[in-house]
């Protein structure tokens, strides 16, 4: 990644496209920041991310973008990385592929140990984020709601580094100790991020935040003779340096000099807690807590780490009781910065709920003697703390809630006209008494213009039964559900686009993230049933799935028009009216989104492939992922990336077995 240029501008957007439709007006208004909190109400397919990128370019502020799940965060990261190739666009999500938190269920008397699977690449990207924030100003961080969980303090992360200077003398044993204190691990066989090895007078270090280079340190006696960046695959020297600041290998660093102080405060808290249990006559809880804590203290003293070390974070960071943990937003406190909350109608409620969920789980662990009360101080931010850290914020949503509108003091910027000038789809309401037979007729009519169909139902049973029925009527149909892996999901969507399927049936997977321009009909079964899957926002999101095609239509099957249906239909019609007026005034003709189908047939080798075939498939998919990104087809790029991850897991699992 290149460093920023000496140009006065920090951020440089690179794109072959210029803002169109509603984008120029939205960019100009958002960049004014008439209020510190604003809403970008952008209809599906209007290019909201491109608008935000242009705002970043205009305001020239370090930025955090938060999405409500990893998939959307990955899509935003890929897109912004392409748009800002010379800036530090970083990815900050939870590094757990699987996470079962520690818990105690008093009603059952069951203790559940923490269990987790760490994704090393995501872990590296998190360290890369902190490294960039500690060393650069031109940083855009794309994260999930996990961003409100604790991380290393800015002061500590910046402090723990190693300056390497050509000509300076280093004792190799001392250098090894310094690397270990930065959480680097010796590995003589294979260098991966966070590892180092000694080979005579040469030390090779793979920085914990790097991907495309290894640091080679060549010594003559005790003197550092050369610092070189080398290619980790070819060992080719990329460049030589006079000096280098090596950052930590890991996100969390324990200050060895102050460790004794932390151990003393943990012991003091343990002593007080044991007295508390004694007063209440709970000897079993006291004994349990003493055993667990003393074991952890021994490990901390010996290794600087222990199982569940995060529960002692407040002591290790020397924070006062009940204080706010350090988090990613603390790296942005030195000046103005921008926060973008993507899909704010979902992201803000998630942020609100995480604090109380964490407190509730830990209260039982503390009450029954599994953890000290200070464990509560390692927690996500409360919503109030999250709000306190905000500088400037843009809430982005096709369906913002009343809260975001109030927070922005009604400063809502609408972006309804698409770059393709497509209209929001026409919405038709039909009785649901004959919905299945009517759907069959509609799917057959779709064949006239080679259109595809999405159908959303309320239950798994309904989805399975409907899929079976449609198959009996010779409809090429598939059922897409939550248990389908990314690779299989990608195959289904690609086959739908190719025409191998003409219809996909699903439940709640059809609201966000499915971008299939061939879909010209979305059918919503039981649209009048009250509840979250059929509220106004959900219905508008579902309607948006048909907004990529010039023939886009939505059929709501319902015997009555519910209040939520009425609101969604009226909002869709309001948008259609604005879009039609714009097209008429500017003489624009709507065009179906053009999106190449790049995925080739060999992907169907899948899990039954030989290892050689899988390796070839990974190579092919990597090429297609890059091509999709180059074409700005970011949703497909993310789907392919997730498929590569799955294949790599299968590949590694086969090797280990």
From Swiss-Prot:
Keywords, alphabetical: ATP-binding, Cytoplasm, DNA damage, DNA excision, DNA repair, Excision nuclease, Nucleotide-binding, SOS response
Natural source organism: Mycoplasma pneumoniae (strain ATCC 29342 / M129 / Subtype 1)
GO biological process, one term: nucleotide-excision repair
Domain (UVR) ranges: 615-650
Binding-site residues for ATP, renumbered to this chain: 42-49
GO molecular function: ATP binding; ATP hydrolysis activity; DNA binding; excinuclease ABC activity
Domain Helicase C-terminal: start-end pairs: 435-597
Oligomer status and interactors: Forms a heterotetramer with UvrA during the search for lesions. Interacts with UvrC in an incision complex.
Family: Belongs to the UvrB family.
Gene3D superfamilies, alphabetized: P-loop containing nucleotide triphosphate hydrolases (3.40.50.300), UVR domain (4.10.860.10)
Protein name: UvrABC system protein B
Any Gene Ontology CC annotation: excinuclease repair complex
CDD domains the record matches: DEXHc_UvrB (cd17916), SF2_C_UvrB (cd18790)
Keyword Zinc: no
